[in-house]
Curated annotation (Swiss-Prot):
Single Gene Ontology MF annotation: toxin activity
Annotated protein name in UniProt: U-myrmeciitoxin(01)-Mg1a
GO CC field: extracellular region; membrane; other organism cell membrane
Function statement: Toxin that may interact with target cell membranes, producing a concentration-dependent leak in ion conductance, possibly via multimeric pore formation. It produces an immediate sharp increase of calcium concentration in all DRG neurons. This influx in calcium stabilizes without resulting in any observable dye leakage, showing that the effect is not simply cytolytic. This toxin may be one of the major contributors to the pain associated with envenomation. The toxin also displays a weak cytotoxicity (on HEK cells) and some antimicrobial activity (MIC=2.5 uM on C.neoformans (var.
Main location: secreted
Pfam families tied to this protein: Pilosulin (PF17499)
Keyword hit for Magnesium: no
Family the UniProt entry places it in: Belongs to the formicidae venom precursor-01 superfamily.
Lineage: superkingdom: Eukaryota
Signal sequence coordinates: 1-26
Length: 86
């Protein structure tokens, strides 16, 4: 049952990430038949902030998932030990 909650949580986070992702459009800065001389303009701030937040979010999810997995493994080991002894 806990695995179902984990999968549901990951699915919700995935959908929210897609919904709140910044929209990106390619815009021509010059005439397509102009010379090869030009300049490049980049806006890396938006991508860097979005990626950093996503990394923290994935880190938190990974910690929770590891905690849940550790609890499940401990419970399974305790049940096996109880079966072996009793």
């Amino acid at each position: 049952m806990k695995l179902l909650y984990l999968l549901l949580t990951l699915a919700i986070i995935f959908v929210l990430t897609i919904v709140h992702a910044p929209n990106v459009e390619a815009k021509a800065l010059a005439d397509p038949e102009s010379d090869a001389v030009g300049f490049a303009d980049a806006f890396g701030d938006a991508d860097a902030e979005a990626t950093g937040g996503l990394g923290r979010l994935i880190g938190k999810i990974a910690k929770k998932g590891a905690k849940i997995a550790a609890e499940a493994a401990a419970n399974a080991a305790a049940e096996k030990a109880a079966e072996a002894l009793g």
